[in-house]
């Protein structure tokens, strides 16, 4: 028996239902279909609000930047740092556990053109080139997935004896909720401000318009349900 992965099932239902409801409502004035479409739109809106977490940042103790190959999150962190929004920045990441190595700079490789062995090396270079003093950049270069970003970042701040009462989290827009959940788990007493960045073309406004966006968002929903359910069972 072939088992369809959860995120593929969600994506399939989402795509088919979306196409069916939109097509049906265009062809008929049936009140039930109109009502179904309204319910579906509310569901999509709730999903967007959940996945695309965002806050207005306030003065914090630190800015966290989970590992990735895009420079935009670290650029945003540098911008916030230079505005006096935090005293420290902690980029985190070795490389993806899936790839087994740093897979390279995904955008602006003409600007960030060094040979990087880890995500942390790359993000550090982005921060420095955007005006952040090297001594204000903490180091975490062992994490290979999001939960480890949070775990090892906590170890770094504990070792540095930093009291983190408030923190800013700079991450990819559709990755925001899962990042927040993991970091909040490791910093239960910390107030977080999520500052998401659109790095790969998938945004809150356009994710429903193409398969790549639907894949990204439904994949996040699936991972949150699966990963946190397993964690709670333990």
Role assignments for model-derived ranges:
Residues 2, 26, 36-37:
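The identity of the second residue at the extreme N-terminus of proteins
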Residues 3, 8-10, 19:
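Short hydrophobic alpha-helical segments enriched in small aliphatic residues
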Residues 30-213:
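A structural signal for short, hydrophobic/glycine-enriched beta-strand patches
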Residues 201-234:
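C-terminal capping/extension of enzyme domains
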Residues 19, 27-28:
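Intrinsically disordered, low-complexity segments enriched in serine/threonine/proline/glycine
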């Amino acid at each position: 028996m072939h088992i369809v992965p959860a995120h593929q099932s969600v994506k399939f239902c989402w795509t088919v239902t979306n196409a069916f409801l939109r097509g049906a409502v265009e062809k008929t004035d049936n009140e039930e279909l109109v009502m179904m479409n309204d319910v579906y739109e509310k569901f999509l809106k709730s999903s967007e609000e959940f996945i695309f977490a965002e806050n207005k940042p306030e003065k914090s103790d630190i800015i966290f930047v989970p590992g990735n190959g895009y420079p935009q999150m670290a650029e945003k962190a540098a911008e916030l740092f230079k505005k006096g929004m935090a005293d420290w920045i902690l980029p985190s990441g070795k490389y993806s556990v899936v790839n087994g190595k740093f897979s390279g700079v995904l955008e602006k490789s003409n600007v960030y053109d060094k040979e990087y062995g880890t995500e942390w090396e790359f993000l550090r270079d982005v921060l420095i080139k955007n005006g952040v003093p090297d001594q204000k950049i903490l180091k975490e270069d062992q994490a290979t997935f999001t939960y480890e970003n949070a775990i090892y970042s906590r170890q770094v701040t504990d070792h540095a004896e930093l009291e983190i009462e408030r923190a800013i989290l700079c991450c990819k827009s559709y990755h925001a909720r899962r990042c927040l959940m993991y970091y909040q788990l490791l910093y239960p007493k910390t107030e977080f401000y999520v500052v998401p960045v659109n790095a790969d073309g998938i945004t809150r406004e356009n994710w429903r318009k193409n398969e790549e966006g639907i894949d990204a968002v439904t994949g996040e929903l699936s991972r949150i349900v699966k990963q946190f359910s397993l964690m709670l069972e333990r």
